[in-house]
């Protein structure tokens, strides 16, 4: 991906700035419409969506498993997305993002990307190995993502496991010790970012002490800011 300084305009208009705030989900696409009945995975960029990206200076996209069926196909899709962004008035490259945590949450096919056992198992190795496996797993994931043209990963998960009834975080957490979770999370951030991947730590303000899955309901975190 070219550097932003090399391609960007000196100043962006209000419309361009607004477009840069948007990150779109193109999980499915049907030429006849993209309503609830459309379940055709978008694996290549249609011209109509390419125009949306270029005409509205879209800042980023998020890829899901529907968009990533093979190595060659994903590389081609990433290239098509960046070509569309290069035709925008701002000339800014896209943030191409994904959820590839390295455990249960993985959007890349198992035969395309390296599978890991997840953060809880990394946390279990802390006493003997420190942050070693956190760094190494992030490095492997980062190298695979950059090879596919992806530059943002919604990871690591730094929620602290505090609720045994939590239906959505559980094994995605490094554990129940806040200090250990922070050390392992920082190690993964370093592993990702030193290999070209922008990280997005999650989940704010904390999903480790809830009994509701935020994908299906509204969790309540009953803690003070302190």
What are the roles of these predicted feature ranges?
Residues 183-187, 191-195, 201:
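Metal-dependent enolase-superfamily TIM-barrel catalytic cores that perform enediolate-based chemistry
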Residues 2-45, 188:
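Boundary/entry segment of secreted carbohydrate-active catalytic domains
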Residues 29-33, 37-38, 42, 52-181, ...:
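Enzymes and membrane/adaptor proteins characterized by extended Gly/Ser/Thr/Asp/Glu-rich
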Residues 10, 146, 193:
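Short polybasic/polar patches that bind polyanions
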């Amino acid at each position: 991906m070219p550097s932003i300084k090399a391609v960007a305009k000196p100043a962006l208009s209000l419309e361009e700035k607004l477009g840069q705030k948007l990150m779109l989900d193109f999980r499915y696409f049907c030429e006849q419409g993209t309503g609830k009945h459309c379940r055709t995975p978008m694996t290549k960029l249609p011209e109509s969506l390419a125009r949306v990206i270029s005409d509205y200076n879209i800042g980023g996209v998020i890829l899901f498993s529907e968009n990533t069926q093979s190595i060659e196909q994903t590389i081609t899709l990433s290239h098509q997305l960046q070509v569309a962004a290069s035709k925008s008035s701002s000339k800014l490259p896209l943030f191409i993002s994904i959820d590839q945590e390295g455990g249960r949450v993985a959007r890349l096919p198992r035969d395309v990307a390296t599978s890991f056992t997840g953060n809880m198992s990394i946390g279990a190795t802390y006493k003997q190995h420190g942050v070693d496996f956190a760094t190494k797993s992030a490095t492997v994931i980062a190298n695979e993502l950059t090879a596919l043209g992806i530059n943002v990963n919604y990871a690591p998960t730094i929620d602290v496991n505090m609720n045994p009834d939590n239906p959505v975080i559980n094994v995605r957490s490094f554990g129940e010790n806040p200090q250990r979770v922070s050390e392992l999370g920082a190690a993964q951030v370093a592993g990702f970012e030193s290999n070209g991947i922008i990280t997005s730590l999650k989940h704010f303000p904390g999903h480790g002490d809830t009994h509701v899955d935020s994908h299906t309901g509204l969790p309540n975190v009953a803690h003070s800011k302190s």
